[in-house]
């Protein structure tokens, strides 16, 4: 029997890579999409799968539309990737972030509990829940201390998933994913901001790159690797929570160096520090310990940061040269 999966946030970076993986595994893939005037499906087109997905109208803020999508798709698996996922924007849109990233998870879990209790559920949690770090490396037992409305909303989504698993016996797992990037990353995220700027500077269309805290350290991986961990979680007999990370941390400054060196430039000639890009509360270091995911799921990242950044720079060079 063909397995069916419902993916929220299917037009985002992770949703597109996950949809491609599921299609390759023979799934029938349903995507929850809100009606938007702007073109939101460009990532699915980039991967050549836009026409292979069954789209369901819905909005995570609207419980009724979420219920309709679950009933119509009759999925064996639901992957909740829908989110207002940019930390910086959550300071300007704290209520919207809370509704979508927090309350929206409850809408989906409640729909599964009522109408499809055998469905397996994946919740996209985030390393931003750790925030003000309480340990050198963060694992599944590290205390949470979120430092942004985004982190707080995601923590609600994480704990309501645990609550429904323990209270109602749902097969509901959370992946606590550390930063993961790709050529499909939104331009508002620092990695794409850097690789896009590198391409424009190399092609003579931009003179400088302005950033905030370049000493912040992040554990960066490739989104295409990380969606495999999501799928593996829902293939386990027992639902659980897993940190998904590389276990290696790099500063924003060093990431800039990798990107500029790929096109034969010195980042110090172009990087300018701009106080406007500093946040009200910064998370200085995020470093994940993926030992549990490696042990239980057999998952390991396959793409190094150097390979990832080079891949992104090359993609942006192609994009910018076509403009």
Swiss-Prot record:
Pfam families: GDP_Man_Dehyd. GO terms for biological process: 'de novo' GDP-L-fucose biosynthetic process; GDP-D-rhamnose biosynthetic process; lipopolysaccharide biosynthetic process; O antigen biosynthetic process. It catalyses: GDP-alpha-D-mannose = GDP-4-dehydro-alpha-D-rhamnose + H2O. GO terms for molecular function: GDP-mannose 4,6-dehydratase activity; NADP+ binding. Pathway: Bacterial outer membrane biogenesis; lipopolysaccharide biosynthesis. Its EC number is 4.2.1.47. Signal peptide: none annotated. The active site is at residues 126, 128, 150. It is an enzyme of class 4 (lyase). Its cofactor is NADP(+). Keywords: Lipopolysaccharide biosynthesis, Lyase, NADP. NADP(+) binds at residues 11-14, 36, 59-60, 81-85, 154, 180, 185. Homotetramer. Belongs to the NAD(P)-dependent epimerase/dehydratase family. GDP-mannose 4,6-dehydratase subfamily. Catalyzes the conversion of GDP-D-mannose to GDP-4-dehydro-6-deoxy-D-mannose. HAMAP family: GDP_Man_dehydratase. This is GDP-mannose 4,6-dehydratase. It comes from Pseudomonas aeruginosa (strain ATCC 15692 / DSM 22644 / CIP 104116 / JCM 14847 / LMG 12228 / 1C / PRS 101 / PAO1).
């Amino acid at each position: 029997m063909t397995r069916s999966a419902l993916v929220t946030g299917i037009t985002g970076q992770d949703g597109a890579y996950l949809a491609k993986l599921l299609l390759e595994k023979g799934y029938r893939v349903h995507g929850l999409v809100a009606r938007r005037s702007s073109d939101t499906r460009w990532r699915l087109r980039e991967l050549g799968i836009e026409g292979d997905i069954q789209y369901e109208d819905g909005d995570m803020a609207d419980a009724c539309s979420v219920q309709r999508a679950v009933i119509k798709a009759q999925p064996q698996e639901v992957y909740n990737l829908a989110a207002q996922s940019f930390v910086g924007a959550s300071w300007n849109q704290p209520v919207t972030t809370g509704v979508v990233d927090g309350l929206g998870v409850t809408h989906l879990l409640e729909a599964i509990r009522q109408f499809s209790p055998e469905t397996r559920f994946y919740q996209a949690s985030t390393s931003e829940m750790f925030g003000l770090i309480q340990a050198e490396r963060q694992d599944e037992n590290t205390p949470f201390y979120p430092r942004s409305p985004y982190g707080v909303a995601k923590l609600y989504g994480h704990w309501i998933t645990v609550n429904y698993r323990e209270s109602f016996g749902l097969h509901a797992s959370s992946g606590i994913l550390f930063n993961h990037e790709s050529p499909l990353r939104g331009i508002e995220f620092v990695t794409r901001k850097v690789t896009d700027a590198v391409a424009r500077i190399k092609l003579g269309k931009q003179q400088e790159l302005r950033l905030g805290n370049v000493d912040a350290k992040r554990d960066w991986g490739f989104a295409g690797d990380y969606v495999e961990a999501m799928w593996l979680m829902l293939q386990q007999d027992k639902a659980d929570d897993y940190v998904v990370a590389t276990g290696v941390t790099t500063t924003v400054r060093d990431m800039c160096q990798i990107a500029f060196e790929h096109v034969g430039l010195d980042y110090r000639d172009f990087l300018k520090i701009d106080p406007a890009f500093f946040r009200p509360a910064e998370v200085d270091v995020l470093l994940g310990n993926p030992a549990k995911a490696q042990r239980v799921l057999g998952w390991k990242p396959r793409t190094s940061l150097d390979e990832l950044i080079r891949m992104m720079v090359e993609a942006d060079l192609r994009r910018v040269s076509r403009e």
